[in-house]
């Protein structure tokens, strides 16, 4: 399966059969190279990936400044140290799951809930971890 198929079929999927889906998603290498993304995923800046990777290494690094992605600022909320970063902005937000080689991004807007976004992103991230990726 191609990386684009993982994005299209596992991240931009119909959530719970309700016709809802994430607003944007991507799979990005730890070096910031985009492996695959939805058409709506923002253009990443190198310093944004650097900050995200530093937060995985030093949990709490992004809390004072917020998480920036494509120039959008998210308030960092409780995640899982070294494994998951979660952010909130208005009625939407972001979940980032770290695997051995990649970062799995999911961005949501209402009516999709934070829990639904977490489930979709973390399910694929856990699968990739099981595959050694």
From Swiss-Prot:
Post-translational modifications: Phosphorylated by MAP kinases.
KW Transport (keyword) present: no
Matching Pfam families: Profilin (PF00235)
Record-listed Phosphothreonine modification sites: 113
Subcellular location: Cytoplasm, Cytoskeleton
Paired cysteines (S-S): 13-117
InterPro entries registered for this protein in UniProt: PFN (IPR048278), PFN_euk (IPR005455), PFN_sf (IPR036140), Profilin_CS (IPR027310)
UniProt key word Cytoplasm: yes
Main location: cytoplasm
UniProt keyword terms in alphabetical order: Actin-binding, Allergen, Cytoplasm, Cytoskeleton, Disulfide bond, Phosphoprotein
Motif range (Involved in PIP2 interaction): 83-99
Gene Ontology CC: one annotated term: cytoskeleton
Single Gene Ontology MF annotation: actin monomer binding
Other information: The variability of the residues taking part of IgE-binding epitopes might be responsible of the difference in cross-reactivity among olive pollen cultivars, and between distantly related pollen species, leading to a variable range of allergy reactions among atopic patients.
Description of how the protein assembles with itself and partners: Occurs in many kinds of cells as a complex with monomeric actin in a 1:1 ratio.
Summary of the function given for this chain in its UniProt record: Binds to actin and affects the structure of the cytoskeleton. At high concentrations, profilin prevents the polymerization of actin, whereas it enhances it at low concentrations.
Family as reported in the entry's similarity comment: Belongs to the profilin family.
Protein name, UniProt field: Profilin-1
């Amino acid at each position: 399966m191609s990386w684009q198929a993982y994005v299209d079929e596992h991240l931009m999927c119909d959530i719970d059969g309700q016709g809802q889906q994430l607003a944007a998603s991507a799979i990005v290498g730890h070096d910031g190279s985009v492996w695959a993304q939805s058409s709506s995923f923002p253009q990443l800046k190198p310093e944004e990936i650097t900050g995200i990777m530093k937060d995985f290494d030093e949990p709490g690094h992004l809390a004072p400044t917020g998480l920036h992605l494509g120039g959008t600022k998210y308030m960092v909320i409780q995640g899982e140290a070294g494994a998951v970063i979660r952010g909130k902005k208005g009625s939407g937000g972001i979940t980032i799951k770290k695997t051995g080689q990649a970062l799995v991004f999911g961005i949501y807007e209402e009516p999709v809930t934070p829990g639904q976004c977490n489930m979709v992103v973390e399910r694929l991230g856990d699968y990739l971890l099981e595959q050694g990726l």
